[in-house]
Every structure is written in C-alpha cells, then in structure tokens.
C-alpha cells in the first residue's frame, strides 16, 4: 500500500493500539462559518480524520437526518466551490486528513480533473463517492492519485465475496465497509455479520477497514473495535446533535460528542 496522508494516519493509530475516529459532517449545515468552527473543534477533541459531505439534492445513500442536513446546506447557498474556499482558509489549521463525501453529479458537473485539482489545492486527502460503481472507478482513481488524493470505495453486506475482494484491492487509503443494508442513519444495534465481513476483507487486502452507516454511540465503536476494524465513521448521530443544538451551542456539542466517542477507540488489541 502506497504512503498517503490517510495511510500514514492509520499506521500511527495502529501503533497506538486503537482505532481511528472518523466523524462525518455536512458542509454548510447550518452555514460554512459554523462548519469551519466545528471542523477545528472535532480536531481538537480527538477526531483522527473527518469526512466532509458536499451537499447534493438527491443523496440516494443517505437517510433522513443527512438528507435534511444537505437540504439545509443547499438552502444556505453551499456549493463545492464555497466548500473549497472554506477549506483553503483552514488549510494551515487543519492537520488531520479531510475526506470529501460527494455524489457523482457534483464531480461530473465540475469535471473530474478540475474537482480533484481544487480538492488537492485545499489539502483534501481522500474522496468517497457512494454512487460510483467499481467498473467506473479507475479513471477517477487515477486522476485523484495524480493529485495525492485517495479514492475510497465502499463494500456493503450484500456485496458478493469475489466483488468485495476486487473492491478492497482497488480502494485507496482504506476500504469503507457499510455496516447495514440500506441508507445512512442511527441504529440501536449493528448487524451481526459485519464482524465476519471485516475478517473477509482483512484476509483479502492489507488496506485498513473503516466501518460506517449506523455507528451512533460508544457501544457501537467498542463493537467495531472488537471486530478488528481499523476505523469507525460516525455520521447521522453527530449531524443530528448539531442540528438539535442551538446556534450558540452547535460547536460545543459537536466537540463534546467527539470527545466521548474518542475515549471508546482505545485499548484496541491486535491479533
């Protein structure tokens, strides 16, 4: 596996015998000024990497919480260019990898080369495109790699075993394991077969594995850690807390939740 910002972060975290905490945040919800403050607050409270969503009007992989966040962000005038501008202004302060989560349409509208070029200029380390099939990933992966950006691919519980191996072999930075069948959203419990999927991926690839979709609390992070995964992505639960907090408390609420989750990433014992 080649050395990138993301792979180096996972290597460092593994030496610390814990898993990576990777919160998801919707850019522009409620506005980009608040998003900038929350990004720094998450970093200060133990986030190892941050997945930053580019709002899109038809987010097929997302449940109602993140759909509403995207709608609010779009209503506030958030666009890829404005997100890039915000990240450029934070570039000297953000020291952890930023991974953009975007659907194909905003990428295509801007042009793959131009999107990746702008992302690179503002310090983006990774890219997740949930509606990009494996068969169409090679071109974007090559462009992203030329800009030192990892294109991260997703594996779902319903993905056939042979295809899962191909995705894990193609994904850069880490493999994103979707823990549930369906869309993003908070869950009271995680599906039992995810642990075996983690093992299958580890048997077929040296790439780190991060589990997302439905990871909502400390118990879920402990479960992800016990499965032997390398990272936990927390999205809807954080987005919901930010949405429910008053405008004065959104940044503080995000930070306190992140700090609580970070504590659960420790004591990761490798076999």
From Swiss-Prot:
Its EC number is 4.2.1.20. Pathway: Amino-acid biosynthesis; L-tryptophan biosynthesis; L-tryptophan from chorismate: step 5/5. It catalyses: (1S,2R)-1-C-(indol-3-yl)glycerol 3-phosphate + L-serine = D-glyceraldehyde 3-phosphate + L-tryptophan + H2O. One of its GO terms (molecular function) is tryptophan synthase activity. Disulfide bonds: none annotated. The active site is at 51 (proton acceptor), 62 (proton acceptor). One of its GO terms (cellular component) is cytosol. Keywords: Amino-acid biosynthesis, Aromatic amino acid biosynthesis, Lyase, Tryptophan biosynthesis. CDD domains: Tryptophan_synthase_alpha. It is an enzyme of class 4 (lyase). Tetramer of two alpha and two beta chains. This is Tryptophan synthase alpha chain. The gene is trpA.
């Amino acid at each position: 596996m080649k050395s990138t910002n993301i792979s180096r972060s996972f290597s460092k975290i593994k030496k610390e015998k814990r898993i990576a905490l990777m919160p998801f945040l919707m850019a522009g919800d409620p506005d980009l000024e608040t998003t900038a403050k929350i990004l720094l607050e998450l970093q200060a409270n133990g986030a190892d990497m941050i997945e930053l969503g580019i709002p899109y009007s038809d987010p097929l992989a997302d449940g109602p919480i993140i759909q509403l966040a995207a709608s609010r962000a779009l209503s506030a005038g958030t666009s890829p260019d404005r997100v890039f501008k915000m990240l450029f202004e934070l570039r000297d302060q953000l020291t952890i990898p930023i991974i953009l989560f975007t659907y194909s349409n905003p990428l295509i509208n801007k042009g793959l080369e131009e999107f990746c070029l702008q992302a690179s200029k503002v310090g983006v380390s990774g890219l997740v495109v949930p509606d990009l099939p494996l068969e169409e990933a090679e071109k974007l992966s090559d462009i992203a790699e030329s800009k030192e950006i990892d294109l991260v691919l997703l594996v779902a519980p319903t993905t056939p075993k042979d295809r899962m191996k191909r995705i894990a072999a193609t994904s850069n930075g880490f493999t994103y394991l979707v823990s549930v069948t369906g869309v993003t959203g908070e869950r009271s419990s995680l599906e039992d077969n995810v642990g075996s999927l983690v093992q299958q991926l580890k048997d077929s690839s040296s790439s780190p594995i991060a589990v997302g979709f439905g990871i909502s609390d400390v118990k879920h992070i402990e479960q992800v850690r016990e499965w032997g995964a390398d990272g936990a992505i927390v999205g809807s639960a954080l987005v919901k807390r930010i949405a429910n907090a008053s405008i004065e408390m959104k940044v503080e609420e995000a930070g306190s939740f992140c700090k609580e989750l970070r504590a659960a990433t420790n004591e990761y014992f490798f076999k």
